[in-house]
């Protein structure tokens, strides 16, 4: 498993395929991910397949768990879960991306419809992962499919997810985000995570993810915490995308007639003021 993860991180051909990570690009050697359930082992197995020998094998063990609600979580109302079709991607610096996301407590046909619509817009915008706040819904819900193609791989839905464990090994990798069109940068993340969540029917389960699925999950989970991927970039990486972030802030002001709710340049000044800026 460690060798497979190392191959995933270091292989140049595989790197080109996955870049930008959360905004799919075409590749002459497509790799698809499938999720298989083995009843005897009660586990899930992500595997990579392509015209070349597989470079990634990710094992994810899942089991039913009983878990109480997280204290202090506000419960989403029917109004919080109402939406208009088609969904639209919310772009930085819209304050929706920073707002607190409410816990889902109603697992009905409306939620299933929302999930379907999220997958639909995700595929149409060439994404492999999407969180509810990215479509204007401040609730704790994410969807992803590492294959990035409808009918391929496996569609994963996580409701009210919580991380119970992160691996100690940290891996840097270039990411993109549907809320930041044409912007990519290196982000360091743990190689694997253990997650407690609910499925579309409200059933709780625990799952361990590694490599690509773990990274996609962490990116989307950050969204549910109001954290954006550039928040975790080094100053050096951030400087390479600063002008594009400023352009998105200007686009927001032009579209809404409102001042930008946050400024990447102000953020840099504040960091410097408390001793974390560049010398």
From Swiss-Prot:
- Gene Ontology biological process terms from the UniProt entry: translation
Q: What does this chain do?
A: Removes the formyl group from the N-terminal Met of newly synthesized proteins.
Sorted keywords for this record are: Chloroplast, Hydrolase, Iron, Metal-binding, Plastid, Protein biosynthesis, Transit peptide
Under the heading Pfam families, the entry gives: Pep_deformylase
Identify which cofactors the protein needs according to its UniProt entry.
Fe(2+)
Alphabetical list of InterPro entries matching this protein:
Peptide_deformylase, Peptide_deformylase_sf
**One CC-aspect GO term:** chloroplast
Q: Which family does it belong to?
A: Belongs to the polypeptide deformylase family.
What is the name of this protein? Peptide deformylase 1B, chloroplastic
Q: Where in the cell is it found?
A: Plastid, Chloroplast
Q: Which SUPFAM superfamilies match?
A: Peptide deformylase
- Binding-site list for Fe cation: 177, 219, 223
Q: Per its UniProt entry, what is the enzyme's top EC class, as one word?
A: hydrolase
The residues annotated as the active site are 220
Q: What one GO molecular function would you report for this record? A: metal ion binding
Cofactor binding comment, as recorded: Binds 1 Fe(2+) ion.
Q: What is its EC number?
A: 3.5.1.88
The scientific name of the source species is Solanum lycopersicum
This enzyme catalyses: N-terminal N-formyl-L-methionyl-[peptide] + H2O = N-terminal L-methionyl-[peptide] + formate
């Amino acid at each position: 498993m460690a060798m497979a993860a190392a191959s995933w991180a270091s292989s140049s051909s595989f790197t080109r395929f996955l870049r930008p990570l959360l905004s799919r690009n075409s590749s002459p050697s497509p790799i698809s991910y499938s999720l298989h359930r083995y009843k005897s082992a009660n586990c899930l197995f992500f595997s990579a397949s392509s015209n070349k020998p597989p470079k990634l094998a990710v094992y994810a063990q899942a089991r039913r768990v009983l878990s109480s609600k997280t204290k202090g979580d506000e419960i989403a109302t029917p109004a919080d879960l109402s939406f208009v079709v088609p969904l639209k991607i919310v772009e930085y610096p819209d304050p929706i991306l920073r707002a607190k996301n409410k816990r889902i407590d109603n697992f009905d046909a409306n939620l299933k419809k929302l999930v379907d619509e999220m997958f639909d817009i995700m595929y149409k915008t060439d994404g492999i992962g999407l969180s509810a706040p990215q479509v204007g819904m401040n609730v704790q819900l994410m969807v992803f499919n590492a294959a990035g193609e409808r009918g391929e791989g496996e569609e994963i839905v996580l409701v009210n997810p919580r991380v119970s464990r992160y691996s100690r090994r940290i891996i840097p990798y270039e990411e993109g985000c549907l809320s930041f069109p044409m912007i990519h940068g290196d982000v360091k993340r743990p190689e694997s995570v253990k997650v407690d969540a609910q499925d579309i029917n409200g059933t709780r389960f625990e799952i361990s993810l590694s490599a690509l699925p773990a990274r996609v999950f962490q990116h989307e989970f950050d969204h549910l915490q109001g954290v954006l991927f550039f928040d975790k970039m080094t100053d050096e990486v951030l400087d390479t995308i600063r002008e594009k972030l400023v352009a998105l802030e200007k686009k927001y002001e032009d579209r809404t007639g409102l001042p930008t709710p946050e400024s990447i340049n102000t953020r840099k000044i504040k960091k410097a003021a408390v001793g974390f800026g560049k010398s």
